[in-house]
Amino acid sequence: MEALKRKIAEDGIVLSDQVLKVDSFLNHQIDPVLMQQIGREFARRFEKDEITKIVTIESSGIAPAVMAGLELGVPVIFARKRKSLTLTDDLLTASVYSFTKKTESQIAISGNHLSKDDRVLIIDDFLANGQAAEGLLSIVKQAGAAVCGIGIVIEKSFQPGRDELVKKGCRVESLARIQSLEDGKVTFVQEVRS
């Protein structure tokens, strides 16, 4: 997605050869116009999949997931990382390690919101090692629902997340794929267009 790549090139800050800071438009301050374009692009890529629900993880996955849900006309469920007094019944849970925060979280979704009849699109802001996506996959499978695909805003292609998800039979659609963050510079994967 060219608009996203431009925004990353202009406003993204390379903190190391492993970490890209995009808090000025994606995961702290949100650019609503860009987020709307992201939602439309996910909807375009998954429009034929008969998606019934979108599942994401709090908090940075919520904005792109909601915009995609708006475009597809389907509800969005976000997995919570913290216990809630209201999130108690029929919990579907998984353990997730955050590459950026270097912490492990127990994520949960109420089983009341997912059923075996659902066709789910998983959306997240970043794909690095694939831990968040794998946790969400586990939760969706616990509900007996079908995973139609995984939509990623920014993929760090130099990390193993995509390969791990593809090995599990997942379709992964990333809007911007980063080949490298070496020497303080963002280099994108050159996609072959068919």
UniProtKB/Swiss-Prot annotation:
Report the locations given in the UniProt record.
Cytoplasm
Protein's UniProt name: Xanthine phosphoribosyltransferase
Described by its record, this protein's role is as follows: Converts the preformed base xanthine, a product of nucleic acid breakdown, to xanthosine 5'-monophosphate (XMP), so it can be reused for RNA or DNA synthesis.
Q: Gene name? A: xpt
A single Pfam family it belongs to is: Pribosyltran
The residue range of the signal peptide is: none
Reactions catalysed: XMP + diphosphate = xanthine + 5-phospho-alpha-D-ribose 1-diphosphate
Q: How does it assemble?
A: Homodimer.
| GO CC list | cytoplasm
**Keywords annotated in UniProt:** Cytoplasm, Glycosyltransferase, Purine salvage, Transferase
Q: What is its EC number?
A: 2.4.2.22
Question: So what family is this one in?
Answer: Belongs to the purine/pyrimidine phosphoribosyltransferase family. Xpt subfamily.
Output the superkingdom of the source species. Bacteria
Residues that bind xanthine, according to the entry?
20, 27, 156
Annotated residues that bind 5-phospho-alpha-D-ribose 1-diphosphate are located at 128-132
Q: Which GO terms describe its molecular function?
A: xanthine phosphoribosyltransferase activity
Q: In which pathway does it act?
A: Purine metabolism; XMP biosynthesis via salvage pathway; XMP from xanthine: step 1/1
Q: Which GO terms describe its biological process?
A: purine ribonucleoside salvage; xanthine metabolic process; XMP salvage
Q: Which CDD domains does the annotation name?
A: PRTases_typeI
